[in-house]
Amino acid sequence: RPQDNFYRYSNGGWIRKNPLKPAYSRFGTFDILQDTATSQIRHIVEELIAKPQTKGTNDYRVAVLYKQSLDSAERNRQGYKPLIPELQALQGIQTKDDLLKHIAQQDQVYGQGCLFGTGVAADEKNSTMNIFLFTQTSLGLGSRDYYVESTPEVKQILAGYEAYLVRILKLSGYSDAEASRIAKATIRIETELAQFSYSNTELRDSQKNYNIVTIADFARDNKGFDWSGYLRLRGLDVATANFMQLNFFKAF
């Protein structure tokens, strides 16, 4: 009945006739575009690997990467060994300076934002120029709600996340005690970050996410993190930036 569930009343027939495939949580125009693009890229890559490539060329690199990605037997043989240098680097962090250097290195070498993200985009109030951006981090569970809400369902999800972290850490060579300690510390840090993260509603507010500040002024007023030092370690000459989720960065 429309008074019970108007969405089902108006769309129910179409939904029943067009059930979602098990791999999809939704399926629309953009999903069709993505599937088409993925299929086309796969066709291009499979043509590459079917013939010899000259070592050092981009075609060669693509072919090698694709073959390595499919070689699950070799990945299983190596286990977590390729990650050992990264794990050792994390274990070597003792001071704020160590942490600063590690974050800058991860961003610069791998493009992997730690604690926060960075990028460049068009200035929303001056489309003739681009501007450097600082953005809040993506938490392990995605939404901040999983960390700040206290419903039974959320608590169950958080407990499952902790169990998952423990399992991954144990597979990476950590003892049961160490795995449990690191997993709890990870959730504690992510929960603290979530306290200052913008909600999904706030992230859609373009005005609230437009906070142009000079690096010098922001660094002077927010000394919990060496913002100027971070940019210097990355070799970036940035005078002004958009700290999109301003309260998140002030919390540092």
Describe each region flagged by the PLM.
Residues 2-4, 9-74:
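Active-site-surrounding "flap" and adjacent substrate/cofactor-binding loops of secreted or lumenal enzymes
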